[in-house]
A protein has these predicted regions:
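Walker A/P-loop
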Residues: 19
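Hydrophobic anchor at the beta1->P-loop junction of P-loop NTPases
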Residues: 10
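P-loop (Walker A) phosphate-binding loop of NTP-binding proteins
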Residues: 13
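Small-molecule kinase domains that catalyze NTP-dependent phosphoryl transfer to phosphate-bearing small molecules
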Residues: 121-164, 171
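Conserved phosphate-donor/acceptor-positioning beta-strand/loop module used by diverse small-molecule
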Residues: 99-119
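ATP-binding Walker
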Residues: 16
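Conserved substrate/cofactor phosphate-moiety recognition/catalytic segment
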Residues: 23-68
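Glycine-rich phosphate-binding loop used to anchor ATP phosphates in small-molecule kinases
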Residues: 57-100, 108
Length: 175
């Protein structure tokens, strides 16, 4: 009997380190990886680039596309997949949980000042630092009934990755 796919969704506000952490997890598990930003429509990217926060209606097609990608990985028999997605609200996470398989959230949560400094240092990303406050305002923490962990990642990427991988393996995932 085959095991169901476990989808790790590395989540959090813009600039929190999702991509770096997800790539470390993907490398450790040698699993398929999807950068959530790649699933946004050009209209969404333009809107965010102009400093205009996305509405729920803007996000729903994006979330459904990510969910469908996750289900495709299950259909291929993958043991694990890794996805980056802000997943700011529970209702957004509910859409992702509709994917075939088990969905586990890894919420990266640096302090505001650390996150802002990281965003200011980024070059060439469509998401501007001004968007951080709007995302923080709507962020809903993981509920006690949601599979996942919150990592306060104020440290260096290697420290955050080590904490994340230790938690994932402590849950019984991985080799």
């Amino acid at each position: 009997m085959s095991q169901q796919t476990v989808h790790f969704v590395v989540m959090g506000v813009c600039g929190c380190g999702k991509t770096t952490a997800a790539q470390a997890l993907q490398a450790d598990f040698n699993s398929p990886y999807a950068e959530g930003d790649d699933f946004h429509t050009q209209a969404n990217r333009d809107k965010m680039g102009a400093g205009i926060p996305l509405t729920d209606e803007d996000r729903y097609p994006w979330l459904r596309n990510l969910r469908d990608w996750m289900s495709e990985q299950s259909g291929k028999g993958e043991r694990y997949s890794v996805v980056t997605c802000s997943a700011l609200k529970r209702q957004y996470r509910d859409i992702l949980r509709e994917a075939e398989g088990e969905v586990v959230f890894i919420h990266l949560a640096p302090p505001h000042d650390v996150n802002l400094a990281r965003m200011m240092a980024r070059k060439g990303h469509y998401m501007k630092a001004e968007m951080l406050t709007s995302q923080e305002a709507i962020l809903e923490e993981l509920g006690a009934d949601e599979a996942g962990v919150r990592i306060d990642n104020a440290g260096e990427p290697a420290e955050v990755e080590a904490e994340m991988l230790a938690w994932v393996k402590a849950q019984g995932f991985g080799g």
